[in-house]
Amino acid sequence: MSANSQPIFDHLTPMIPAGKDMDAALAFYEQKLGFTARYKAEDMSMAILQRGSVEIILQNLDDPHTASQTSLRIQLTGVDALYSEYQAQAIPPFHQNVDGAGLGALKETPWGTKEFAVRDLAGVCIAFYERRS
């Protein structure tokens, strides 16, 4: 990079806790959410998951407090199709005060997005959204 060049940010890859069972967390992300494990550590301490250009690092860490305080927002094109895909995976409805995975309602927001949230097995909340034109 030359002295006059400005840095360009390309991607953000969050690291999130897997919860009590790394194998179950991997299965949830692969089978329910459609991610692919691009890398799995031999000792299963972490895995790099990918779907499209989005990457998530899943850590073999059981920390319910951290998980419940972690949330991600993933922007995409085709939020309606993704919501239908996740409904077909029989992810149970999202309830605020219930542990376990959950699927939130698809809604339009006042800030110009159409979105829904998924809570994973550890309690991490992931919002999938599309900007409305």
Model-predicted segments: where are they?
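N-terminal beta-strand motif that seeds the catalytic metal site of vicinal oxygen chelate
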Residues: 1-26, 72, 129-133
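Short glycine-enriched loop/turn motifs at secondary-structure junctions
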Residues: 7-10, 64-69, 110
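Vicinal oxygen chelate
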Residues: 19-22, 72-125
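Short, flexible helix/strand-to-coil boundary loops that buttress conserved ligand/catalytic motifs
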Residues: 29, 62, 86
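Alpha-helical segments within the soluble intracellular
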Residues: 30-31, 50
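Conserved acetyl-CoA-binding loop of GNAT-fold acetyltransferases
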Residues: 31-37, 90-91
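Conserved short beta-strand elements that form part of the metal-binding/catalytic scaffold
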Residues: 36-71, 76, 125-130
